[in-house]
């Protein structure tokens, strides 16, 4: 089973442009997010889903330089971007991640993933109704 994290990433934030390329202790937010996702034991693919436009060319260059997997798709239709990213990398289960969350908890993600598999869910979330941790 191919389990992957798809990280939704873009540079076009109006409040804090390019925030995902800003650094904390010499690591970009994106690098921190990826390193935390790598701690999710059951995940075997981490891929960035980025908009296909000139505004995100710098992001694409960064991802290439770091040898991070990525897929470009619609800026406006994020669901479509996820769909084609999952299809390209043949993902059976997707964990949806936002790129501006350097405090993502890999242990909570693993716990939710195991719940998803055990209960044979179609969809699992802890934000529709706040139920932290699971």
Where are these regions (language model features)?
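Short beta-strand-to-loop acidic/aromatic patch adjacent to the donor-nucleotide binding site
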Residues: 85-86, 90-102
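A short, N-terminal amphipathic alpha-helix
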Residues: 29-46, 59-61, 65-66
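A conserved acidic beta->alpha catalytic loop
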Residues: 51-56
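Conserved donor nucleotide-binding strand/loop of the catalytic core
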Residues: 64-76, 87
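Conserved core of the sugar-phosphate nucleotidyltransferase
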Residues: 104-134
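N-terminal nucleotide-binding beta1-loop-alpha1 segment
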Residues: 1-17
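Short, high-confidence coil segments that cap the C-terminus of an alpha-helix
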Residues: 43, 90-91, 118-122
